[in-house]
Every structure is written in structure tokens, then in C-alpha cells.
């Protein structure tokens, strides 16, 4: 941030949707539509299906890694921590209807909380019941670990990479 300011240029954080477009929408809302921002809740949910018994929405290794750590949110002017799937919330959304979501950590929470420190900033992601169940079993069995293990045949494998290969 300091280097960007010193250079007199504007840096774009993320080129995707979240972070990226979400940050631009927040700034647009601040500049054009709202007198005060007290909370920012980003809801990432869809009604899609992969037609498979189980699938992730994007690269399984990245997807699982994102959800095995601590969930951070910015609330009441301070960082709050939770475990994945600890804080549920149902949203009733246009087009997709009622969908269960869980508070999840995500990159834009950090950038938005820096600009809107007075606001609660949370990220919610939709997961179906099957996803939550499969994720929980894989995690409890140690299959989402990035630490190598040695098989009975003496081969060293990383459980998370094996799960990814199987999906």
C-alpha cells in the first residue's frame, strides 16, 4: 500500500469477483448511495449442481485448504475467529431462493476491514448438507492434511493431493 501511494498510482486488489468486483461495489455504495456503512456481508452462493455425488466449486485442493483453517471476520472493530461451519445463516435470495450458508474467511475481509473499520465485515459461502458431511469426514480422517504420510507400501503421499486426484 505504501509503495503504491508513494508511486502515485492505483493498485487493483484482485481481478476476480471476490476480492475484486466486491471491493469496487463497496466503494460505489459508499460514494454514491449510502450515508453510513455499518456492515458488509458478502454472500457467495448459487443453485448450481455438478451432477456428481460430490464436487467442489473450484480446485479441490484450494477449496479444502481454504476451509480447514480458522475463519476470520471483522466485527465490533476487532478480528473474530471461528471454526469452519460453526456460524450458519440462511439467506433468502432472488433467483436461488433460501440457501444455507456458513461464515467463511476470505481475502476481501482484510481489505474491506482496513477501509471500513467501523463496519462488521463477514463473508458467507453456501454449502449443501452433503458437502458439509463429506468435508467433515475427510477432515476428521486426516485426508485434508498437507503433511506427507507413508503408505504400507512405503510410498510417501500427501492426503489432500490424493483426495484431489480422486475427485
Predicted regions and their residues:
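Rossmann-fold NAD(P)-binding glycine/threonine-rich loop
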Residues: 1-11
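Fold-independent oxyanion-binding glycine-rich loops
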Residues: 9, 14-15, 45, 76
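C-terminal catalytic/substrate-binding lobe primarily of soluble NAD(P)-dependent oxidoreductases
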Residues: 32-167
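Short alpha-helices
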Residues: 12-25, 30
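Short gly/pro/ser/thr-enriched loop/turn and capping motifs at secondary-structure boundaries
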Residues: 1, 18-21, 43-50
